[in-house]
């Protein structure tokens, strides 16, 4: 699964987990040696679950941060840079805590664009979705290198249905 990749690619790096849910990708990043993780989610309940997951894995919160926020609004304000960014948004959200309704099909270009602004040079971003009818708008992101890596990110117990989720590696195009 993709969260295992986070553990393999984050040693000595900073890691941002957007729509973090229970922070499993952040746990894997921390166990893989990330020097800092930042997990952002709208739900304090899920972030508290994430904190428990860190504790259960023996990881102190010292360099691992949990931010309750509307991801889109937070991305517009954040100034920190990260080496690895993981984006796993819901298909749809209309929470009262958000500034706007979120729709992954409609909003993914803006989401990825905002996240890429926070990526360090030579950094890497991963965008994942479980929306089965999702179509990546490559034309609107021609300035990025987009590589679909879905087959390598699906756990063995889900191999029978390769459309269970889709995942892309996103990086700036080589100049």
What are these regions (language model features)?
Residues 22-34:
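Conserved SAM-binding loop of SAM-dependent methyltransferases across substrates and taxa
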Residues 36-41:
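Conserved SAM-binding motif I beta-strand of class I
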Residues 1-12:
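SAM-dependent Rossmann-like transferase core, predominantly class I methyltransferases
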Residues 71-74, 78-145:
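S-adenosylmethionine
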Residues 124-175:
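C-terminal catalytic and target-recognition region of SAM-dependent MTase-like enzymes
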Residues 10, 58, 118-120:
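A generic alpha-to-beta junction signature in SAM-dependent methyltransferases
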Residues 43-86:
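S-adenosyl-L-methionine
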Residues 12-21:
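Conserved class I S-adenosyl-L-methionine
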């Amino acid at each position: 699964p993709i969260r295992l990749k986070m553990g393999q690619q984050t040693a000595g790096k900073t890691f941002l987990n957007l729509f973090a849910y229970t922070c499993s990708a952040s746990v894997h990043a921390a166990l893989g040696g990330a020097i800092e993780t930042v997990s952002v989610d709208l739900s304090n309940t899920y972030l508290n679950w994430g904190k428990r997951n860190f504790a259960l894995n023996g990881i102190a919160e010292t360099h691992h941060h949990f931010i309750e926020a509307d991801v889109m609004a937070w991305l517009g304000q954040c100034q920190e840079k990260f080496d690895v960014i993981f984006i796993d948004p819901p298909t749809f959200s209309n929470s009262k805590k958000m500034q706007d309704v979120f729709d992954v099909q409609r909003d993914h270009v803006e989401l990825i664009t905002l996240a890429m602004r926070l990526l360090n040079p030579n950094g890497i971003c991963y965008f994942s979705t479980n929306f089965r009818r999702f179509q990546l708008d490559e034309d609107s992101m021609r300035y990025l290198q987009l590589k679909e890596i879905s087959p390598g990110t699906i756990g063995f117990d889900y191999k029978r249905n390769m459309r269970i989720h889709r995942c892309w590696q996103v990086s700036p195009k080589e100049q």
